[in-house]
């Protein structure tokens, strides 16, 4: 079956691709639209509907004109060093507060250049902010080295482990990032954020619940997914225990997943795992930069209080966001924000092909 271009089936026909226990369902759709370049003559346009086999969430992969930027905006003014930034090295010690001694005797958690401090915003029972490098107010995507990203993740994991030690009820953990305003960042200085408490995030709970249901019927979904996708058109590469691939039905542009084998919770990640995640993320972000992209989100989630029994594996999801133009088109339309249906211009197979060479 064809995965990287519309399958030669009649419009509306459903194609199911079965390998092991996972069925990838897609449907070719056909629209009739006026072509202004042809004087308004009606023309047929193909698009593809796909359904995620685990969650049931669907995505629409468009054909024709792509939304990828042909050039990159000048970030000089946006990223210029301001008179004050709490994450800059000269202000960090006075503008941030140390953790209680029960969490860390040092007050702040440091790994390499990375520093983790308490979050002043109450997003969760326990929340922290990780700064990749207080000495650099702005770090562009292709400057996010494996060491910078890996050390920041390691520091955030150590905070997660400390939280779990002092508050065993905080069983739901995630580490996340907003980079530049289109991704939701309120500060330009690149940073990460975490959430740890007794209630999982909506998408986190959904993945765990569906992983549990899948395991009861078929075994581990995540193990089967990695085995099935290995060396296929959506495969990106393997670094340590982390398998990198693009999802069959993405939720955002340029989306890539990192699935960590045999690890069910964030607190179980080793320093080697964090280095592998950092290396993969660094290479993906460099690929985004080469595609004239400038903004991204990522999220790394654990599986909650029964992660191993539920068959969950730690997964990192990263995707690109709109560029920070003075007037820009948001990539979150009514399709995504209200109905949870992603509109995608580049297929997962195209995304994987563009990134794979860097692995």
Regions found by a protein language model. Give the residues of each.
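Internal helical hairpin/lid segments
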Residues: 278-286
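A generic alpha-helix signature
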Residues: 151, 276-279
